[in-house]
UniProtKB/Swiss-Prot annotation:
Residues with attached carbohydrate: 29, 40, 76
Species annotation: Xenopus laevis
Cytoplasmic topological segments: 150-166
Membrane topology reported for the UniProt record: Multi-pass membrane protein
GO CC annotation, single: membrane
Source organism, top-level taxon: Eukaryota
Gene: tm2d2
Name this protein carries in UniProt: TM2 domain-containing protein 2
Keyword Glycoprotein on entry: yes
Domain TM2: 131-179
């Protein structure tokens, strides 16, 4: 009795599945460790002369230091724990939803201070602004929403093209997007927050 021979297409599909599985397994085993600069954040340097005119660099006022933007770990909690600062996620609608972190700061050139010139400071919110204004997007959605201009503005290009080709879903998609925008369900695609107008 002979075994039935499966069709060639099934054999090729099974071979591709095995190849994909082995390549995914091998890529997981070939990760390289991430190296971060060694920064001593726990111990403050001892001042050389406590009666001298120099203050610790970490005590300088805001106008004499420049600080980096919060580090984006893109959801990697391990990297955040190793570095001991940075943001796992950006943005949020309410204050409780927004993470806070310390940022790396440096004393400006020409400022004399005691101790390390690079230090961690502050409790900065993990928020980024990329030029999206709520009122502008709301006006786009109200007047030009049937052409998908609001979705193009927010960076949702795929759905914007669909909205454009269907004329806003014959008005239904236009109305739904207007409600989503007002209730906070439609945000910029890069997870940034709305810019505030002062």
């Amino acid at each position: 009795m002979r075994w039935p021979v499966p069709p060639l297409g099934y054999l090729l599909l099974g071979g591709q599945g095995l190849l994909l599985t082995f390549s995914l397994i091998s890529s997981q085993n070939n990760t390289s460790p991430v190296t971060y600069p060694d920064i001593n954040v726990s111990a403050a340097p001892e001042p050389r002369d406590p009666l001298g005119p120099l203050v610790l660099c970490s005590y300088l006022p805001e106008e004499f230091v420049e600080c980096d933007d919060p580090v984006d770990h893109m959801g990697n909690g391990t990297a955040q724990q190793e570095l001991r600062y940075g943001c796992k996620k950006f943005g949020g609608q309410a204050y409780g939803d927004v993470e806070h972190t310390q940022v790396m700061c440096r004393a400006l050139d020409g400022i004399e201070c005691d101790g390390s010139r690079s230090f961690l400071r502050g409790n900065r919110p993990c928020i980024k602004y990329t030029g999206h204004y709520f009122i502008t997007t709301l006006l786009y959605s109200f007047f030009l929403g049937c052409f998908g201009v609001d979705r193009f503005c927010l960076g949702h290009t795929g759905t914007a093209v669909g909205k454009l080709l269907t004329w806003g879903g014959l008005g239904i998609w236009w109305f739904v997007d207007l409600i989503l925008l007002i209730t906070g369900g439609l945000m910029p695609s890069d997870n940034s927050n709305w810019c505030t107008i002062y």
